[in-house]
């Protein structure tokens, strides 16, 4: 049975999450709150919230866990060509934390295959915006001719980045933001991005699954490192692909 957490109740050990043969593998607990303090504690333990509007807050720690190592980021020939164009063309920008809440709302509105509605409700936007205001959550945004056309957001502690969601209004705009994030993380020797659950899209970009035990061990060590700066522009794409000669 999945435990219900009161406001002062701690998370159970992640090993108690429901197993692969259950109807909800990885489900660890449920609660009625999404307080910033609860969110911070969750991420530092390798736990994340995911639920539908009208449900209680559901907390997850799946096994295996989908991750992307910045060193293993895959750049297709077409994306490489796009990134070179972005580097040359002043109409393209990468902005960091320009409008965090707007990125979340755009992610909420993005259509997802096989998914109705969104879990990114107004309450979720406010909870993550609280983390953003204290420097624990960030948005990486792709802009073209002064308009935001893609981006992503996630949570960062120490040398660990926890990806949450992304959106694109033009082709490859979310991949541009991800490439910029990967370039920034490479510069700061960050070894892992949490991607939560396996998708073919993430796998095509170099994501892979690892055992939860290994993931949790990495998180525990990484979140205690000093925080990295979150100020960069599209020149971080040079970490991914050199501009055309």
Swiss-Prot record:
InterPro entries: Acyl_CoA_acyltransferase, Leu/Phe-tRNA_Trfase, Leu/Phe-tRNA_Trfase_C, Leu/Phe-tRNA_Trfase_N. It is found in: Cytoplasm. Pfam families: Leu_Phe_trans. Its main location: cytoplasm. It is an enzyme of class 2 (transferase). Keywords: Acyltransferase, Cytoplasm, Transferase. Its EC number is 2.3.2.6. One of its GO terms (cellular component) is cytoplasm. It catalyses: N-terminal L-lysyl-[protein] + L-leucyl-tRNA(Leu) = N-terminal L-leucyl-L-lysyl-[protein] + tRNA(Leu) + H(+); N-terminal L-arginyl-[protein] + L-leucyl-tRNA(Leu) = N-terminal L-leucyl-L-arginyl-[protein] + tRNA(Leu) + H(+); L-phenylalanyl-tRNA(Phe) + an N-terminal L-alpha-aminoacyl-[protein] = an N-terminal L-phenylalanyl-L-alpha-aminoacyl-[protein] + tRNA(Phe). GO terms for biological process: protein catabolic process. One of its GO terms (molecular function) is leucyl-tRNA--protein transferase activity. Functions in the N-end rule pathway of protein degradation where it conjugates Leu, Phe and, less efficiently, Met from aminoacyl-tRNAs to the N-termini of proteins containing an N-terminal arginine or lysine. Belongs to the L/F-transferase family. This is Leucyl/phenylalanyl-tRNA--protein transferase. It comes from Paraburkholderia xenovorans (strain LB400). The lineage of its organism: Bacteria, Pseudomonadati, Pseudomonadota, Betaproteobacteria, Burkholderiales.
């Amino acid at each position: 049975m999945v435990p219900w957490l009161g406001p002062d109740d701690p998370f159970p050990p992640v090993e108690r999450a429901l197993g692969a043969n259950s109807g909800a593998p990885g489900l660890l607990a449920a609660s009625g709150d999404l307080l910033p303090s609860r969110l911070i504690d969750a991420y530092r333990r390798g736990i994340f919230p995911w639920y539908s509007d009208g449900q209680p807050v559901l907390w997850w720690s799946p096994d295996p866990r989908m991750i992307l190592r910045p060193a293993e980021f895959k750049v297709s020939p077409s994306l490489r060509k796009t990134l070179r164009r972005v580097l040359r063309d002043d109409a393209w920008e990468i902005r960091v934390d320009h409008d965090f809440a707007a990125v979340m709302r755009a992610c909420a509105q993005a259509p997802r295959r096989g998914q109705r509605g969104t879990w990114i409700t107004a309450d979720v936007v406010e909870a993550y915006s609280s983390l953003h205001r204290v420097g624990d959550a960030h948005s990486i945004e792709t802009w073209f001719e002064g308009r935001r056309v893609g981006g992503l957001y996630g949570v960062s502690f120490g040398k660990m980045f926890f990806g949450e969601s992304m959106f694109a209004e033009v082709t490859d705009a979310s991949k541009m933001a991800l490439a910029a994030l990967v370039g920034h993380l490479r510069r700061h020797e960050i070894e892992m991005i949490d991607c939560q659950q396996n998708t073919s899209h993430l796998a095509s970009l170099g994501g892979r699954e690892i055992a939860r035990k290994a993931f949790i061990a990495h998180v525990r060590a990484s979140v205690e490192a000093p925080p990295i700066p979150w100020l960069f522009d599209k020149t971080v794409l040079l970490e991914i692909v050199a501009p055309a000669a």
